């Protein structure tokens, strides 16, 4: 068995005693086991086999110079591994990774018997490559040092049966080699370009180098640093950009938040209703007065409205405004309302007249229609907003009454008198009878229920303004114009009398106050007048004209509403002395009048203290 080929058996386990084949021989393991003759003389057989190897004469000179030195004693053998490790030629096994460059790194002599590559570079001497490792046994024989190859053991420092060495280099050769390397390095640094100074192409300067991958020697540190720095800088720039954009937009929103939008906003309801709230109302003054009760609006000389006055009152609508709906039925209703006949019959005309053309002076006018129409308003939106009724899909507006005696009554027929053909009609317009106006109904109510001025004032209630169809029978007698005028005259006389009494009382108080400033004795007369005047409305006026208001003078002294204690009388005397004679008479009234509450019967237009 050749010495260079050392084998070891396959280890089943490396956990201690489980693998007895992989066990190193030592003094402890061999202490109690005596060696036989074959085991002690096993190295002799190895010497004989090594002597039979072929010996080349060309290597004789080099072999004498590069002779392996073997220690003679065990003490010297312990120093051999240290010297060989310093030279860098000791290698136990060929262990390397797949990235090791085989050209620049050496391998162990155990893997090859023919040649051994040294640490010197390719530029060194050539005779180093031809050297072959030699293994010479130790001549000294010891009982505990002999081993055999049959045991498949691996030699260690303690088990020194033979020494594994490599040819050593003399110090003279090493010094010459180092000087040669330094000379070449200086020349290359002087005459070479900077690109050739890369670490990848440089030769190793040390005798021993670690086995490492070529990727470790790559100059990638700075490249990785700058690439990471670029990525981080880009992220920071993006964050700064977003922050600046947010700040800018917040500033713009803050500046525009306080600004008011000058353009008017149109809501959905305004758009549907045809911009009603933005357009001037087309109701005229006459149409507003038509809703006022007849008792206040009526004048002695009344004239019937004509078509010309109605057209003047109406204001033309804007051409750009649209209607609410554009269905065929709404268009027909609007057309029938706008194109009605505005020439109405007088009160003396009867409904039995033939509907033919009649001569009115020198001009001919068509017979009036039996339908009641209001004065035409060109705005369809205004027509829809007016109070009206619908009969058989016909719109009858009720906002304006051109003539009092031209109103057609609307009555509901009894179920017994209805015909089968007219059962679908809710209302029937009777053209043979005239519908009384609101003014006539109010006047008749006032004249029939009141016998005096007080009864007239108490009879005006909200119940008298009900619908005419519910509160007025059809066969009710119609009052004449003279009765209405008489009622209005009596009401006006009552109001004038009350106002005149109040004014006269204040004038008398003012005159008495001026006299009281000159003489203190006249204050008694003033107090008597005040008691008399202040007690009268509480006893008469409030009970007669204001039944809902309770009297407020419940004082036990009997001095009226304003005088309830002697302190107030003393204050009144002192204040009357301090007042100036040039002051206004209305402002110079005593302070007691300020506490008197105004009665409802007193006119609203006067200013009270």
UniProtKB/Swiss-Prot annotation:
Q: Segment Disordered: which positions?
A: 300-330, 342-370, 537-584
Localization recorded for this chain is: Bud neck
Which terms in the GO cellular component ontology are assigned?
cellular bud neck
Q: Which segments show compositional bias classed as Polar residues? A: 349-363, 552-569
User: What superkingdom heads the lineage?
Assistant: Eukaryota
Q: Where is the composition biased (Low complexity)?
A: 315-330
Protein family according to the UniProt entry: Belongs to the AIM44 family.
Name this polypeptide is given: Altered inheritance of mitochondria protein 44
Species in which this protein is naturally found: Eremothecium gossypii (strain ATCC 10895 / CBS 109.51 / FGSC 9923 / NRRL Y-1056)
